[in-house]
Amino acid sequence: HSQCDLHATTNIVATELAQKCSVPPAFNEAGELTNAADIQCCTSDISLAEYRTLQGKMEGADTEATSIEGYLAATPGWRTDLYNSRSTLMTHAESIELFKALGVKMTPELKAPSVEMPFNGMSQADYAQKMIDEYKAADVPASDVYVQSFNLEDVRYWIDNPPEFGHQAVYLDDRYSLDDFDHSDPATWSPTMEELVEMDVPILAPPMWMLLAANPDAADGESRIVPSVYAERAKAAGLDLIAWTFERSGPLANDGEWYHRSTDDVIDNDGDKLLTLDVLARDVGIIGLFSDWPATVTFYDNCMNAKG
């Protein structure tokens, strides 16, 4: 999921490669793990050959664990490890071949480097280009690829340089983390929706809560969830929208789920997932939705778009 998350996405901490980690596991004289909250293992810590010896797992780490076993056993109870059989890790190029064989489209994210760039002579632009080059080498049509990045400069690079891949490049919007940004106040948006369009950015992708607003006074026949000002302004400017991440949250009977933060006051059960999805699809008009699990979104699409 990022350059430095191998400790949470693989079994590296249970192997001899753990000692090569940027922050390896540490133990006291009794053999107890003492730094679970600080362990960090990066792809740049090991060679490709060493990387291939690891096994993948669902992302998660118990940062209060006192043993490696406990550290790895971090899947929330409302998720499942049923399909988590310690999968084979792949390079990006290998994943492209798998996706080609499966006949699916591809939406790679250029992850933010965890090292200072340039790194070993590779600039940020080189990094952005290398990802494109691997699709070209595999003869993947640009129309099958939605390249994405939280770094607007990456998106602008793809628009300007290999433009065929820039035609459906995705700007992942994480400006919610900025102190002076309010998704409900257009005066705080920089760049504005119109400025993004002027840059030829085709697709904007925020977390789904930024596209939604609560409507607590909804009358009979009206929805408790409605499109946000952010969503309305983006659509009015001509931007396509993709949202993330459906079913990442826990049960909606629990208050305070991050991906539903803008509608938390008007939802209270898991059925409201379908209401959220319906508003995103029909009222906001998203063109895509990231989900940790495909079943619910597929069920909705099959139901709403059934062809007789």
List the predicted regions and their residue ranges.
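Phosphate-group recognition and catalysis centered on beta-loop-alpha active-site segments
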Residues: 1-308
